[in-house]
């Protein structure tokens, strides 16, 4: 009773919440969410497409600089799924890749404008465009299958970069 006197707005809000619990028809109409693209008549004319500069192979880069850049770019993707997948893939494969494979990997992770595309191609949820169907994509898909059932919850620590080769 004292709450009603001190906080009348809170009391009204709680009363409405109780009515929603009692009356399903009220809660259905007031809780419906609409997301962009739900409407079949949405023309998406209000969408702004920002053109990205086309990917260009860096021919003036040493192979060690390229490896370091690709390691960084594999770790800093902007979406956690690809950060984990690509950073672990880079840890396992980057040091053993030929220059040709490094160029293919560079193109794969830097040419597509949407990181989800890379993730869907690697997990085989969607087919990759012909230009990306190559030996590096095969390696990435095989890695994404996680045949050894490793626990992959985060990007690897960087200590492995400073370990002495065995």
UniProtKB/Swiss-Prot annotation:
It is found in: Mitochondrion matrix. The keyword Thylakoid does not apply. Keywords: Chaperone, Mitochondrion, Transit peptide. GO terms for biological process: mitochondrial electron transport, succinate to ubiquinone; mitochondrial respiratory chain complex II assembly; protein-FAD linkage; tricarboxylic acid cycle. One of its GO terms (cellular component) is mitochondrion. Residues 1-29 form a transit peptide. Interacts with SDHA within the SDH catalytic dimer. HAMAP family: SDHAF2. Belongs to the SDHAF2 family. Plays an essential role in the assembly of succinate dehydrogenase (SDH), an enzyme complex (also referred to as respiratory complex II) that is a component of both the tricarboxylic acid (TCA) cycle and the mitochondrial electron transport chain, and which couples the oxidation of succinate to fumarate with the reduction of ubiquinone (coenzyme Q) to ubiquinol. Required for flavinylation (covalent attachment of FAD) of the flavoprotein subunit SDHA of the SDH catalytic dimer. This is Succinate dehydrogenase assembly factor 2, mitochondrial. It comes from Bos taurus. The gene is SDHAF2.
């Amino acid at each position: 009773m004292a709450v009603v006197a001190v906080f009348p707005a809170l009391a009204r809000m709680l009363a409405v919440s109780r009515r929603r619990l009692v009356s399903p028809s009220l809660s259905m109409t007031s809780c419906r969410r609409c997301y962009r693209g739900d409407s079949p008549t949405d023309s998406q004319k209000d969408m702004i497409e920002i053109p990205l500069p086309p990917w260009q192979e860096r021919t003036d880069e040493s192979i060690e600089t390229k490896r370091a850049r690709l390691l960084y770019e594999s770790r800093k993707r902007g979406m956690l799924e690809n950060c984990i997948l690509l950073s672990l893939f880079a840890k396992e494969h980057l040091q053993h890749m030929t220059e040709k494979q490094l160029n293919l990997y560079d193109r794969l992770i830097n040419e597509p404008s949407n990181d989800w595309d890379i993730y869907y191609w690697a997990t085989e949820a969607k087919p990759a465009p012909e230009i990306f169907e190559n030996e590096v994509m095969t390696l990435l898909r095989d890695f994404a299958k996680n045949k050894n059932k490793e626990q992959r919850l985060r990007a690897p620590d960087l200590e492995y970069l400073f370990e002495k080769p065995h």
